[in-house]
């Protein structure tokens, strides 16, 4: 219903965009007359008009002229002139909408127009793609247009150094993947120097395949983590146990909800095997998680469908695209359970150091827009989460593809035999065929069947995705047969007769030409080679059209209608003929999860042979209903992820703002003195809770304060015994005032001591380093605590409490306690940290520490306002660097992990190898408490 309401004003928006395109057309004649130099000069003219102090123009004012200029530049450079519908799409993107443009309508070229316009403001434009290949390709291909107009274009790739990233972000337009943009944001907020920052703000982003990135991948947060412990023997032990357990005897499985439940008989079996009395005793509670994960690994995660095993490593397969997600690992011990199941090396679990969801990352942008071929089914979610409207842009030519009704077979074997027969028939007449499967296993099974029938074909799946662009580019040629695990986010058009741009680029690269390295030679060769390729491809395209165009054959319905529509959408681009059909069976996962028994009963009553299909509207309705249910479930999951992350998001904003303030060189003297005041006040409040002065344990208070700073007064001097009482009445306020004055004197003495040691401004330098390192360490500990809290918060529902409300309340309490801890530890370090002077020229660059291993001062990195003649260095610090792990949504699917080398991984002191999360948490708490002076100083 909400989707329908959101579409009510769509017609008016499309009419408005059409008027924009018509106005741009009226400017075309004048723009065409400009020379190349004059066309390029328009960029500087537009910038001056934006910056005019007397009568500045807005980007909206410049839109028609800027679009006309960019359109003409695209024609001169690429031999491609954006159609009116592409101009409409560009205007929709500039206005902050999602432009729904069907496959083959030229989304990549459309993006050039709003990117050029918004780059004129000088704040940077980020263009987000689904993988590194597309980011590099588009930055080179479309970057030719922008460079022709005098703009700088950068690209962010996973392999780049921070210096290379900084250059790319300083360009006018920056291409990259959602993961790279997000991880750079997190890394910037882990940096120890302004010089380490790479991003320069979040002004405007255009997200390609916006539904894939903002919807499908939104369930998976971006996480930077470090090693937390070694592998546990419990994973292996429970993998052995569950192999001995029987489904429906020891445990039950719900495929629809993807859950497992252990029966009483199963618990007794595990208890007998482990020799324990009660699995659910507090001491044994970590074992329950191992058992549940082992059962899920056995029943819910299937080899060659959900993951593959390659070179002794478990690699996750993306459910949406069928690609291998190199390095991706499930959280909460799930990946270790699968490794134990497959008898491969069990790798250590990680501890979160920084995290953000894609929803909250993209909401950082002042303006956000996106492009996709399928967005209407998700219009409500895009509006609710991101405040993005969806505008359906008309196709340039009418769609004439024929979408055939589904064929349903009783068995999977009969279905696949029918698929092979159909493909063989199409191949004989020269019609190209694209077959979509949902798993690597199915694609390889079909490949073997085609080989038996001597049908030449290409396989495009998780195991061979390196060659995917080349395979897709020729998938529309005569007699081409392509088997693909899924077609979401492939990024290369299937053009009848072959993709002309790709084939031309391929030929030029074989000759050693590159659009970035050798731009002049490349441009010259492009214009001479392109007509030849067009002529060759045009002749073949005519033959393919005669044969019926591209035939898309789906072998299974996906749980998302969008993925099905994306597969269909590969055929019938730009008014070409085409055809699509889905072959289904009762063994398909969607059928088994929803209404499988009903459909099987229907086929049994009809008494049809296995190889005879049925076409029934009832089945189509059942499938649509099932897909709608799954989509709604996934929407609820994503909303739930966002609700929980919103708690962290508010806390993250506070911490990141504080870090940035420290980095940017503001004087922290008043803040440090404020911390001293707050901590001493808290100690005194803890010591004076008893109403009678004689009950105060001032000796304990002085002892505790002595661990913070060198106390210069004795409490005896504050009290004077007389004849009538043990001591004069001493008020809490008098005690506080005396100690605060004493602490201020001690702080001034500490500052003088450091000034003598390392020169004027040394104390400011120490303040900056102490606060930065303490904030980082306490924030990491807090993330760990919040992970643990969220892990078990769902159990609060059993006590009739809302888990989200409980998470918000306890998360807030933990955050405030963390801030108190930051103050307490910072004060202790400021007064007591042993430092030495080091000539500034000999100071090594500061490395980002894995944990709180020390405070390293660096004049250049920290940039204090008052320069010290020498740098400060803490003594007896073991600087340990540990490799970081980057976990987030895959390039165009669910999740991936990227490892960053950085020294040997060590288990933190005091934490046993193989420790459970609960054990690690308690050890971390004990370790953290060791450095803190106790506040409990009341007299007993």
From Swiss-Prot:
It is a peripheral membrane protein. Monomer and homodimer. Part of the essential Sec protein translocation apparatus which comprises SecA, SecYEG and auxiliary proteins SecDF. Other proteins may also be involved. It comes from Mycobacterium leprae (strain TN). It is found in: Cell membrane; Cytoplasm. This is Protein translocase subunit SecA 1. Residues 867-878 have a biased composition (Basic and acidic residues). HAMAP family: SecA. NCBIfam families: PRK12904.1, secA. Part of the Sec protein translocase complex. Interacts with the SecYEG preprotein conducting channel. Has a central role in coupling the hydrolysis of ATP to the transfer of proteins into and across the cell membrane, serving as an ATP-driven molecular motor driving the stepwise translocation of polypeptide chains across the membrane.
